[in-house]
Every structure is written in structure tokens, then in C-alpha cells.
Swiss-Prot record:
GO terms for molecular function: phosphotransferase activity, for other substituted phosphate groups; undecaprenyl-phosphate 4-deoxy-4-formamido-L-arabinose transferase activity. The lineage of its organism: Bacteria, Pseudomonadati, Pseudomonadota, Gammaproteobacteria, Pseudomonadales. CDD domains: DPM1_like_bac. Its EC number is 2.4.2.53. The keyword NAD does not apply. InterPro entries: ArnC_tfrase, Glyco_trans_2-like, Glycosyltransferase_2, Nucleotide-diphossugar_trans. The keyword S-adenosyl-L-methionine does not apply. Keywords: Antibiotic resistance, Cell inner membrane, Cell membrane, Glycosyltransferase, Lipid A biosynthesis, Lipid biosynthesis, Lipid metabolism, Lipopolysaccharide biosynthesis, Membrane, Transferase, Transmembrane, Transmembrane helix. This is Undecaprenyl-phosphate 4-deoxy-4-formamido-L-arabinose transferase. One of its GO terms (cellular component) is plasma membrane. The chain crosses the membrane at residues 235-255, 269-289. Catalyzes the transfer of 4-deoxy-4-formamido-L-arabinose from UDP to undecaprenyl phosphate. The modified arabinose is attached to lipid A and is required for resistance to polymyxin and cationic antimicrobial peptides. It is found in: Cell inner membrane.
Length: 341
């Protein structure tokens, strides 16, 4: 592993209804970036906020000498789509992603850049003494275990978005066309050298988490369907297992009837109902999982943009559009933008 030359660092931050956190976020992130020995830019992507977040970002980008780039999406597309929109606009040799809620402190940015300069393709982080509720921690642990088993990459905390990526990794992710993207997993698929560092984790000071129970369930389906086809194989295994259990149970019912007569359990009516519910439930679970895969395939086949950029405001020269080679054809754009200032 060789040291990686760095000339510019990009910080990409998705923003959704974070107007209370934005002033402190900008102040602390700018202070952390000024400690770096490189040029820097802070790219904030408004993901269809319903509060005043978009206007605050535009004002910050319009200030004289500002290193802030405001990317305004026309509606809410989700955290990972917003980060991909920021990736398209960044020009750094190292790109760092950061949440806007300040639970992961921007002061950790220099440490991530230091590790990336050593030659790592991906620098991940692990939240030390995580300040979330058990409702958030336990599903996160299950997801981390599932991801580790499926990808074979033993990283501890896939849910922490404070990460650093080498430019080549970002370009490789931009070349991917699927709509359902989980960035840490996608990046690890392209990385040769990865590492993890412990970072501080604070309680959320403003607002509330944007991940409700339904969004966490949706995220779990995204993880299952974007990283592996193992659930489809498991359906076959479960189907064979249930069929075998059904035959064994039928044999047991015959033996019980011969041994104890027809009245031993009310003619077996309730047992049959229980078996019916189990099999019906299993069928619906399988149909739902197949529907998830088919729905995502349908979305990918339509090839619509993952997001629509309404406008971009910056005081710096725009980053060149990433060049993507597909079947010998060169494409230089992966989304749609209405206005760039």
C-alpha cells in the first residue's frame, strides 16, 4: 500500500429538515477543514427539505469566499441518493461523507483524511459509546451482522456514514446504475484496502431522527436486495424444509388417528388450521420478497434518473462530470440538473 497524494478534500453532507443544526454544522465543519493542509469544499445537498434548510444553504454558498456548494434537489429521494448527487458535484481526491445531525462530530475529519493519505481506499468509522435508543441499536447490530456475512468484509459499523473514500472509489460508484444503493456496501465492493477508526458519537441536539420504523424496514429491504441474492436461495431452502415438515406432520397425524381414534383432538381441525396459517404466511413472505426484487428490477430497467438536481450554487469552478464507459460508449452524466449557478 502506497501513500495517496491529496490536493483537495470534499465533504458531502445530505440535509433534510435540519435548519436548527445548519449554522453550527457549517461553523464546525469549516473549522475542521481549515486544519487541513489541502484545498477543501463543503457540499451540502438539500434532499427536498420542507423547512428553511434550502434557503440557508443557498445563503451560505452565496457568501464571498465561501467554500460551500449548495446542491438543491427538487424533492426527497433519500439519504443515499442525496449523497450520490453530492458525489457528482465534488472535485476532491478524497471525499468524506457526514450526517447533518452533528451526532458524528466534524472534528473527526482530519483523522479520516490522515488515514486516507496513508493509501486506504475506504476509511470507515465505528461509533464509540453510541448515543441512540435500543430501538435503533439492536436493528443496526442485526444489519451489520447480515452485511458482514453476505459481503465477507468484516467492518463493524455499516450504519455510520462518517467515512472517507478515494476518488477512484467515488467514480466507480457513480458508474453504477442501480437505483437502490447502500453506499458503504457498494464502496467496499470496489475497495482493496479498508480500515476503521473509532469516533465519538453524541446525542442529537436538534430535531428528531429521519429514520422512522417504516424507513428502517425499507432500509433493511434495500440492504437485502442490493447486496445479495441469498434471500432468493433461502426461499428454496425454506420451501423444501416446510414441505418435508408437512409430510412428517401428515404422517404423525395418521399415526395419532390410528392410535387414539378420530376424537383425540377434535378431528384435528385446529391443528389443520394452524398448519394452514403457517404455510400461507410462508407463501406471502416469499411472494413479498420476490415482489421486492421484481420491483427494483423494474425501476432499474426504466433507467430514470436517481434524482433531479434543481440547481447548484458555488463560488468555485464546477467539477467535471464523471466519465462513464458503457459498452464502448462514453457518457459524462448520470443524473438530471435543471440549473447550475
Amino acid at each position: 500500500m502506497k501513500p495517496y497524494p491529496i490536493h483537495c478534500v470534499s465533504i458531502v453532507i445530505p440535509v433534510y429538515n435540519e435548519q436548527e443544526s445548519l449554522p453550527e454544522l457549517l461553523r464546525r465543519t469549516t473549522a475542521a477543514c481549515k486544519q487541513l493542509a489541502y484545498e477543501y469544499e463543503i457540499i451540502l445537498v438539500d434532499d427536498g427539505s420542507r423547512d428553511n434548510s434550502a434557503q440557508l444553504l443557498e445563503d451560505a454558498a452565496a457568501e464571498d469566499g465561501s467554500n460551500v456548494v449548495a446542491v438543491i434537489l427538487n424533492r426527497n429521494y433519500g439519504q443515499h441518493a442525496a449523497i450520490m448527487a453530492g458525489f457528482e458535484q465534488c472535485r476532491g481526491d478524497v471525499v468524506i461523507t457526514l450526517d447533518a445531525d452533528l451526532q458524528n462530530p466534524p472534528e473527526e475529519i482530519p483523522r479520516l483524511v490522515e488515514q486516507a493519505a496513508l493509501g486506504y481506499d475506504v476509511v470507515a468509522t465505528v461509533r464509540n459509546n453510541r448515543q441512540d435508543s435500543a430501538f435503533r441499536r439492536w436493528p443496526s447490530r442485526l444489519i451489520n451482522l447480515a452485511v458482514q456475512r453476505s459481503t465477507g468484509v468484516a467492518m463493524t459499523d455499516y450504519g455510520c456514514m462518517l467515512r472517507a473514500y478515494r476518488r477512484t472509489i467515488v467514480d466507480a460508484m457513480l458508474a453504477c446504475r442501480e437505483r437502490s444503493t447502500f453506499i458503504p456496501i457498494l464502496a467496499n465492493g470496489f475497495a482493496r484496502h479498508t480500515t476503521e477508526i473509532l469516533v465519538h458519537h453524541a446525542e442529537r441536539e436538534h430535531g428528531e431522527s429521519k429514520y422512522s420504523a417504516m424507513r428502517l424496514i425499507s432500509l433493511m429491504f434495500d440492504l437485502l436486495t442490493c447486496m445479495t441474492t441469498t434471500p432468493l436461495r433461502l426461499l428454496s431452502i425454506v420451501g423444501f424444509s416446510l414441505a418435508a415438515l408437512g409430510m412428517l406432520f401428515a404422517f404423525a397425524l395418521i399415526v395419532m388417528r390410528l392410535a387414539f381414534g378420530a376424537d383425540w383432538a377434535g378431528d384435528g381441525l385446529f391443528v389443520l388450521f394452524a398448519v394452514l396459517f403457517v404455510f400461507t404466511g410462508g407463501q406471502f413472505i416469499g411472494m413479498g420478497l420476490l415482489g421486492e426484487y421484481l420491483g427494483r428490477m423494474y425501476s432499474d430497467v426504466r433507467a430514470r434518473p436517481r434524482f433531479f438536481i434543481e440547481k447548484v450554487l458555488r463560488n468555485q469552478p464546477a467539477a467535471p462530470a464523471p466519465v462513464v464507459v458503457v459498452d464502448g460508449l462514453v457518457s459524462s452524466h448520470t443524473s438530471t440538473s435543471a440549473d447550475q449557478v
